[in-house]
Structures are given as C-alpha cells and as structure tokens.
Amino acid sequence: MELLPARVRITAILKKALFSGEYKSGDELSLTDIAAKLGVSRTPVREAFQALEAEGLIELRMNKGAIVKPIDEKYITDHYEMRILLESEAAARAAKNGMPEADKLIEKLLDAQKRMESLSTSEYEDLNFEVHTGIWTAADNMRLYKMLSNLWNGPSIGFTSPKLDHYIKSTQEHINILTCIKKKDAKKARKEMEQHIERSMDNILKNFKFR
C-alpha cells in the first residue's frame, strides 16, 4: 500500500477543518500547536501551511503561524468541481488501461463492510486513500496524479453525515467504481466517480452552511 505523505495528509486534515468551519476566518493557526496535536514534527506542518497559502486559504505570518482567510461556498464548489472533472477522468482512464489491483482493493472493501461498526478512523482513511491513489496510478498520467494529490482533502465526514453512515455509503461507492474499472466500463466508471465526489461536496457544503 502506498503511504500517504505527511505533507499531503496534514494538508488534507487542515483543509477539511477549514471547509467544515472548525477553523474560521481570522483564526490563528499555530504551527507548533498543530504539530503537537497531530504528533508530527514542525516540518510537514510548515509544508502544509505553504500549500494552503498557495491555495489562498491562509496567510502566513512571520514566526507566528498563519491566519485563516475567508472561505465562501463558491471556493468549496470550485474545489470539488475540479476534483469531479479530474478524478472522473482518472477513473475512466483506469478502466481503459486496466487496474490489476482492483480485485485486491475490492476484497479489502468487502472485508471492511463486514466490520464497519468497529472500523477505526485511521483504517478507513488509509483504505480510502489507497483506493483513490490506486485509481490515479492506473490512469497512468503523472501530471494528473500530482494535480489530484494537491486537491486531496480526505473523507468528507461531518456532523451532518454520521461517521458510520459515511463509511457505509463511501465503501459501497468505492466497490461500485472499482467494479466498473475491472469490467473496463470507462463510461460508467466516470459516472460512478462523479456521483461519489458530488456526494462529498454536498456533505461539505451542508457542514459549511451549518457553521
């Protein structure tokens, strides 16, 4: 399994917190505090801050961490529309190219379904990332892979979507996508991925409205 790079993982965690409203406009983000909270060194947090600043989500302060910038619904919609465009294309390409590891991933997902109530957050997130990056890899386009990696923001779990409910829906959607890829049905793989990301976007937007 491909491990989630620390910078990408932390960027995804912070991006999800920004989108859900855990961090609001004007809030100060302490590099040291976040590193301690996540149990990592300051280096990957600093790299995550730089990535978030490049996206216009935060403003870096010299030796003082960062300040959260205003985020509106259009920013979130634009972000997810890009994921829909690129990730649905990746799924279609994976179906055309073939994805040998699809069977193994489907087995892992079916196993996860059997023990859904005891599935840990980290286990779910690792499997979620493994499915998506497996599809990106099978698409066989390094530029596309890097763009999707930069857009990655992890699972869209929030108080409007209970964790178990999200796990159940997302896991079945992953199985559906991989089954289409396995059958080399590029058109359906594209559609299944579009619907998968659209549901994530809808959940994040619901969280945003209830902030």
Describe the residue ranges of each PLM region.
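Short helix-capping and inter-helix turn/linker motifs at the boundaries of alpha-helical repeat units
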Residues: 5, 165-168
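Charged, alpha-helical scaffolding/interaction elements associated with membrane systems
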Residues: 20, 55, 118-119, 183
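C-terminal effector-binding regulatory domain of bacterial HTH transcription factors
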Residues: 1-3, 187-211
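Short linear motifs at protein or domain termini
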Residues: 1-96, 208-211
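Short, flexible turn/loop "capping" segments at secondary-structure junctions
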Residues: 27, 59-60, 128, 169-171
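Conserved amphipathic alpha-helical segments that form helical-bundle/coiled-coil interaction surfaces
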Residues: 100-162, 171-179, 188-198
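A short secondary-structure junction motif
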Residues: 17, 21, 151-158, 203, ...
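Alpha-helix C-terminal capping/termination sites
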Residues: 96, 182-183
